[in-house]
Amino acid sequence: MPINDLQQAAQKIAGFLATLNKLGGLRLKYRISAGSGAGDAEGMAPALCVELAGPDLPLVTQRHGELLLALETIAVQILRLDQREGDLVSFDAANFKALRAQELRLTAETAAEKVRKSGVPFAFPPMNSRERRQLHMVFRDLEGVETASSGEGPGRFLAVYPEGKTNLPVVPPVKPRGFSRR
């Protein structure tokens, strides 16, 4: 179900963020863009874009932007969107997503080169569906490799294979110690 009333949806998100600031003791400012003019750093065109700023911004972007992703997830729940429609809402902070997209592209290019030279599949650590999709799109433009997602839930990851060899076994990535993703 798409977002029918963008202004009402933006008001709900603003209310959530105001409550988060008040009850959480956070100092975050936010700007919400709605409609066809909304756009995010990943080149997608969500219905609602929320740009965060303020003194507590580092809290939002640390640990690979986990809090940023969590805020998006909560916003999707508040708006009662289907999980597959999560891309209709985008949160960003200090251009974090554009920088992360650039980091993913560079990592993908390095992984592709490694797979082409070695002939051995490469597995990225588990990541959210948006980042996996970004990687799949980057790899589409790179020759000599193919990709596939594997695993389930928060352990889902992207594997890179030599072209035509997706039947090769891939070693699933290991989570770093002290890292937990719920």
Residue ranges, per PLM feature:
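Intrinsic disorder
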Residues: 2-182
